[in-house]
Amino acid sequence: MHQQLQNIIETAFERRADITPANADTVTREAVNQAINLLDSGALRVAEKIDGQWVTHQWLKKAVLLSFRINDNQLIEGGETRFFDKVPMKFADYDEARFQREGVRVAPPASVRRGAYIARNTVLMPSYVNIGAYVDEGTMVDTWVTVGSCAQIGKNVHLSGGVGIGGVLEPLQANPTIIEDNCFIGARSEVVEGVVVEEGSVISMGVFISQSTRIYDRETGEIHYGRVPAGSVVVSGNLPSKDGSHSMYCAIIVKKVDAKTRGKVGINELLRSID
């Protein structure tokens, strides 16, 4: 459906080092802007689940990267201050009717860049959502949360205060970080480098997970990398070295819960009863 658009972007990306705001041709500029608009509206997304597997559409990520090559910095008005950046703000032209129509609540001074999709019944406290991100319905993005470029946030997710969800642009990553539906990410936790937190998982406060973080399941003894299995309750911890001379940080799966249990038991209770 978007093959021609993809072809233009793929071709332009191969010569991206030579592209500047001054010399970007009309075809490339229009293709990139169209791709960003499709991301902004949610019509397309950088990653989606197909037949149970997450698939990254690399050409859309390339469109995001190209947008930084073709656009110059410009003055951006924002409340009582001004900004100077290449990417305009998503809500710059919204009026009350459009906010009502799209069903999004935005508390000042939450910032969302154009090219990020924010679904209905989402609440944005003072937070930051970067270009290419996808935030699905019913999600709470709490105070001082950062949702990185192209990150994928599922339905009914709670991102607690100060949570960091890593992006793909800086440093450049192959795949976006993904938080699936009905997950809870505790305050000040960080999930980065394309890690996938699968559906219904609960991450405690202050847990840091990257591709190199060992995710230890204490019930089975398994160690996972880059993926938190569905329904996991995860806390921070340590694992001893082979010679016992020291221990190193890890994330520990202390239990598994299903949707029925989550529905009956509060998040705090799940995290308190881990012994």
Curated annotation (Swiss-Prot):
SUPFAM superfamilies linked to this entry = Trimeric LpxA-like enzymes
A single Pfam family it belongs to is: Hexapep_2
The subcellular location is:
Cytoplasm
Involved pathway(s): Amino-acid biosynthesis; L-lysine biosynthesis via DAP pathway; LL-2,6-diaminopimelate from (S)-tetrahydrodipicolinate (succinylase route): step 1/3
Q: Which GO terms describe its biological process?
A: diaminopimelate biosynthetic process; lysine biosynthetic process via diaminopimelate
Q: Does the keyword Amino-acid biosynthesis apply?
A: yes
Q: Which InterPro entries match?
A: DapD_Trfase_Hexpep_rpt_fam, Hexapep, Hexapep_transf_CS, THP_succinylTrfase_dom1, THP_succinylTrfase_N_sf, Trimer_LpxA-like_sf
Quote the EC number. 2.3.1.117
Give the UniProt keywords, A-Z. Answer: Acyltransferase, Amino-acid biosynthesis, Cytoplasm, Diaminopimelate biosynthesis, Lysine biosynthesis, Repeat, Transferase
Q: Which reaction does it catalyse?
A: (S)-2,3,4,5-tetrahydrodipicolinate + succinyl-CoA + H2O = (S)-2-succinylamino-6-oxoheptanedioate + CoA
- State the source organism's domain of life: Bacteria
Signal peptide limits: none
Which terms in the GO cellular component ontology are assigned? cytoplasm
Subunit comment: Homotrimer.
Q: Which NCBIfam families match?
A: dapD, PRK11830.1
- This chain belongs to which protein, by name? 2,3,4,5-tetrahydropyridine-2,6-dicarboxylate N-succinyltransferase
Query: What is the species of this protein?
Result: Pectobacterium atrosepticum (strain SCRI 1043 / ATCC BAA-672)
